Amino acid sequence: MYTFVVRDENSSVYAEVSRLLLATGHWKRLRRDNPRFNLMLGERNRLPFGRLGHEPGLMQLVNYYRGADKLCRKASLVKLIKTSPELAESCTWFPESYVIYPTNLKTPVAPAQDGIHPPLHSSRTDEREFFLASYNRKKEEGEGNVWIAKSSAGAKGEGILISSDATELLDFIDNQGQVHVIQKYLERPLLLEPGHRKFDIRSWVLVDHQFNIYLYREGVLRTASEPYHMDNFQDKTCHLTNHCIQKEYSKNYGKYEEGNEMFFEAFNRYLTSALNITLESSILLQIKHIIRSCLMSVEPAISTKHLPYQSFQLFGFDFMVDEELKVWLIEVNGAPACAQKLYAELCQGIVDIAIASVFPPPDAEQQPPQPATFIKL
């Protein structure tokens, strides 16, 4: 009999994983403060990593990688992409981005040097001079010059400003209490018809204890309810696809897709009929490349292969597609929720791939092979 503890009562994903484990008959749930467990389903920001793996005779597994915030906080992701040897030269799939600290945080400003970007060795270097240099260059050359400011730890569409005015963007950040990212806004996104609407794509990615990377075969488009236009950046319902914003502010929420969600099968049908292309060849190949590039760049820093405990983690990668069918990484979520209809299959995949590979069920050899819900990258 294997044992597990649950330290995060708010995760719907791990509530389902917990239910599935108990249903096998091979797992027993212990009190949350019991140190002698095989598996911890913990809180992402409060995990006692230093105390894991020290119980004699027990292999211990935890559902997060220590250090994964390098990918999952917006400012850290920008720094990773600019400083990682694997990404700095070859990354063409991440929008131009700058890390900006509010002036009240007393952060040193990195001076622009002929447009050449110095490495971000300091963890607290403000890049506003580089942003302004790029902004002014684009303005002189008549390029699209719309940017989006986002709180590094923000979620659900909070702490966001879209503007073509550099002063407005910097003033907005300077009145906040935390680091932000200013990122080039994708002004020409691929739009869904009918409705001329924006969307983003959520893909779920599972990394097991050996740092094998698995992409969940299903994904979801989060769609806007209102037509996309560039003449009013304050109209969040046409620019931001977050469910909470669409549900709260758009009278057309749910008009085109139930819950403003389109799944991959429907999206593939749309691409085939509207553009004569397939999801796999036009978009998923790019998504797989981006996911693998990001995760391989952090593997040396976060892998648990030589530690006394093991980790796995579910990530949510968010993408946008422009009108040229180029895929752009927007952000990575380290504790993603899941579309309601996908919970059972996604969570069963977590049990089968990430947990049973470390703690195999006693009857593993008699169990029939399961259909591939995750694709190994």
Swiss-Prot record:
Cellular component annotations (GO), alphabetically ordered: cytosol; spindle microtubule
Q: TTL domain: which residues?
A: 3-370
Q: Which domain of life is it from?
A: Eukaryota
Q: Which reaction does it catalyse?
A: C-terminal L-alpha-aminoacyl-L-glutamyl-L-glutamyl-[tubulin] + L-tyrosine + ATP = C-terminal L-alpha-aminoacyl-L-glutamyl-L-glutamyl-L-tyrosyl-[tubulin] + ADP + phosphate + H(+)
Q: Name one GO biological process term.
A: microtubule cytoskeleton organization
Q: Quote the EC number.
A: 6.3.2.25
Q: What does the UniProt keyword field contain?
A: ATP-binding, Ligase, Magnesium, Nucleotide-binding, Potassium
GO molecular function per UniProt: ATP binding; tubulin-tyrosine ligase activity
Q: Gene3D superfamilies, per this entry?
A: 3.40.50.11480, ATP-grasp fold, B domain
Which cofactors are named for this entry?
Mg(2+); K(+)
The record ties this protein, via PROSITE patterns, to:
TTL (PS51221)
Family assignment? Belongs to the tubulin--tyrosine ligase family.
The record's function comment reads:
Catalyzes the post-translational addition of a tyrosine to the C-terminal end of detyrosinated alpha-tubulin.
Quaternary structure?
Answer: Monomer.
The molecule here is called Tubulin--tyrosine ligase
